[in-house]
Structure formats: structure tokens, C-alpha cells
Amino acid sequence: MKRGTQGNIVLEGEVRFCGERIDRLEPHQIRRRGLVHCPERRRPFRELSVMDNLLAGSYLSSDAADTQSKLARAFKLFPRLAERGKQIAGTLSGGEQQMLALARALMFEAKMIAIDEPSLGLAPRVREDVFKAIAAIHAEGIPILLVEQEITQAFRMARRNYVLSQGRIIAEGSAADLQADQTLRASSLGL
């Protein structure tokens, strides 16, 4: 599914967003429709500054006031990025790079953000900050598709959960329902 949201080939089924089939579109066409992917391992433009990374996220907007409004929103959510605006993105810590990736996603006018493994490689305290930021983004009304192996945290955040095994959905439901399934707990959830 993630690959389908990025414009990669889907071998079986289809990916739809806002009623439109998107799995055959190019990544830039998908972004224009408001579905933004925040990739695993963050992937900032390492040689660019924090500010230039954020501005790269607003390339679809030609309105300077709109861009400034988006920057203010990103800096309100991630004040540390405002402090590091001129710093080269490749020199940021892993947690700061994750914050930058989320802030850049907000700059795209996201209607939905697909976030891939946001806690990967982060210290526990930083992980908590990142998940708080994701919750704040969701509280603004932006739906989040969260792919996360930190299952306890994912269960705390999600209204609906899907458990995948080898690319197939093997269970779905609320966190309480999935945690109550003893077979699933032992085989897939690691609980």
C-alpha cells in the first residue's frame, strides 16, 4: 500500500484516495492531490538548510503569504526547527530530522500524511516527542496513515488498526480487540 501511495507499481488490487485511483499516478501527481508520504529514515535534503528543506515542501504554492503561514505553523509545532533554520539538515539529530520530515509534509498542504516508521532509530524520549507531534497534526484534522513497529505506541494513537504479515492484512480492529486476541498477541504482536 505504501508503494502505491508513492506512485510505485501495485501488483494486486488498487489504491484509492478521495475516491480516485492513485496507484498508477506519478509521485508528484499524488502529492498534488494532498497525499504526502513521510518516508522511513526521514530522508531530508542533507546538504540543504532546515529552512530550504521546508521551502522545498511548499513548492506547489506560489503564494508567499501562504508559505509564511505554513512556516509559522511548522515552527509552532516544532520550535526547535525555528532555532535551527540555517543549520544544514544532514547535521541534525535523528529526532530533529524526523521533526523536519513531518514539518515538510505539512508544507505540502497535506490532506493526509502517510508516515513510515517514525520511531525508527530514535531514543525513547525523542520517540515520545515525535508521537506527540503526530497526535498534534492529527488533532488539526489531518488524517494519518501510520506504519509503525512500536505497536504499543501505535495502538495508543490509532482509532483503527491493521496487522500485516508479508504484505497482507491478517487482522483489523480497535486496539482493545486486537490485544484481546490471544493467538494474534502471541504470533504477530509480540505482546
Outline where the language-model segments fall:
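Glycine-rich phosphate-binding loops of nucleotide-dependent enzymes
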Residues: 1-191
